[in-house]
Amino acid sequence: MKALDYEGRRNISGERVRQKRTERKITQVELAARVQCEGVTLEQDAISRIESGQRMVQDYELRALSEVLGASMDWLAGKE
């Protein structure tokens, strides 16, 4: 099965995740730990791959990232 992509990326939210994370001065390790407190297991390397567009993002992961980063899911998905 071929991995889906959008303009060469496996997600549309990675750049926004990185933008919000750096605005909040949170490291990838800190973001991973905070997301885990939301009940979703994401390691630092997964955060890195999400931000670089190399990894798909599940809906429940996007919801946890949204909560931790203080951004709406729509904003992370580029709709706002």
Locations of the language-model features?
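Short helix-capping/hinge SLiMs at alpha-helix to coil transitions
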Residues: 8, 37-38, 53
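A short, Lys/Arg-rich alpha-helix, primarily the initiator
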Residues: 1-24, 74
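Short, contiguous strand/loop micro-motifs
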Residues: 4-5, 48-50
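Residues that mark the N-terminal boundary/hinge immediately upstream of a DNA-recognition element
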Residues: 16, 27, 43, 58-61, ...
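Short alpha-helical DNA-recognition segment
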Residues: 25-49, 64
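Residues in the recognition helix of alpha-helical DNA-binding motifs
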Residues: 20, 34, 50, 79
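Short, basic-rich loop-to-helix N-cap that marks the start of a DNA-contacting helix
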Residues: 45, 52-67
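Hydrophobic micro-packing sites on short alpha-helices
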Residues: 31, 61-66, 76-77
